[in-house]
Structure formats: C-alpha cells, structure tokens
C-alpha cells in the first residue's frame, strides 16, 4: 500500500469538503476513489472516440467537458 499526501490551498479543501457533504461521502479516500472512477471512465470514453458531455434533457442542449488532461487522450481502449 502506498500513502499519498497532498498540499492544497484552504479554499480547495473547503470545496472538497462541500462536495463530500453534498454527496454524503464520509472520507477523503472515498472522495478520491469516486473521482478516480469518473476520470478512468472519461479516459476510456475519449480513447473510444467519444465526447464527454452533460446533457440537459429538458432544454435538449449539451455542454462538452473541456479538460486539458483529457485532450491528451488518443488511441485504442486499454483500461
């Protein structure tokens, strides 16, 4: 097992804590695991040539996620 430690600004820690409250996540480890799961899914989708977006079903609109790390993803699925 590897221990990972992060130094974050106070404001970012407040944002993380608010996300945890909103989603009923109890530990920062669980928050990290959820974030990692979502990121892995996004990378796999980008490798498959898909667009990552949020869809507003009521207004029939969508908004593409723009994230520099995902712009670097190309090629076949390997996850």
Residue ranges: model-predicted function:
Residues 1-7, 20, 62-69, 74-75:
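Short Lys/Arg-rich basic patches
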Residues 77-79:
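Non-DNA-binding regulatory cores of transcription-related proteins
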Residues 28-48, 61-64:
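Short, basic amphipathic alpha-helical segments that act as recognition/interaction helices
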Residues 10-27, 45, 53:
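Surface-exposed, Lys/Arg-rich phosphate-binding patches that contact polyanionic backbones
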Residues 5, 49-51:
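Residues at or immediately flanking beta-strands
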Residues 6-8, 16-19, 31, 36:
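Generic leucine side-chain signal with a strong bias for well-ordered alpha-helical environments
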Residues 56-59:
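Short acidic-glycine loop/turn motifs at beta-strand connectors
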């Amino acid at each position: 097992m590897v221990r990972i430690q992060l130094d974050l600004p106070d404001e970012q820690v407040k944002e993380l804590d608010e996300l945890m409250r909103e989603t009923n996540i109890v530990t920062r480890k669980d928050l990290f695991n959820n974030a990692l799961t979502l990121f892995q899914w996004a990378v796999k989708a980008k490798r498959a040539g898909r667009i990552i977006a949020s869809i507003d079903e009521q207004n029939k609109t969508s908004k593409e996620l723009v994230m520099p790390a995902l712009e670097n993803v190309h090629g076949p699925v390997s996850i």
